[in-house]
Amino acid sequence: MMKKNYYLICVLLLAAFCTTSIATAQNYFGDFPVKADPKTVGNKLSRRLMETKHQLYFDRGIHYAEVCTWYGALRFAELTNNKELIKQLRNRFELLFHLEKDLLPPPIHVDQNMFGCLPLRFYNITKDKRYLDLGLPYADTQWELPANANE
């Protein structure tokens, strides 16, 4: 009988803790100062990306830090249903098929291969096969040791 009561008390305490934690978390993420609101910050970061030149990895194409920022802006645009931002991000990428083709990073290292997440995400959004064809080689070679690498 005492063992049963012990388990009941543990379950009740756990339930109370979970309920309190959820309520606190919801309140914590709902009370941002105006300038720190996630949507405001996301829009500012995305605008900043669109205003800057490409960040390059020496002479080997677009740097993975830009890829991560670009991907974050794209996911932000999707989650906030900002079709105009998706269009702007896509237009920036379109140049890589033609005028800025020399900025495509070579798939020689995990840092450069990160680039593949962008065309694959754009493929997921648009179903345009050009994005799939560009992104898959980066994904497929991400963990391969390049032929000219020193082990």
Locate predicted features.
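Bacterial Sec-dependent N-terminal signal peptides
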Residues: M1-Q26
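Low-complexity, Ser/Thr/Pro/Gly-enriched N-terminal "stalk/linker" regions
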Residues: Q26-L95, K129-L145
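Well-ordered alpha-helical segments within folded domains of soluble proteins
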Residues: I62-A77, P107-N124
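Mid-chain, structured segments of secreted extracytoplasmic proteins
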Residues: K83-R121
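Extracytoplasmic mature domains of secreted/periplasmic and thylakoid-lumen proteins
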Residues: H109-E151
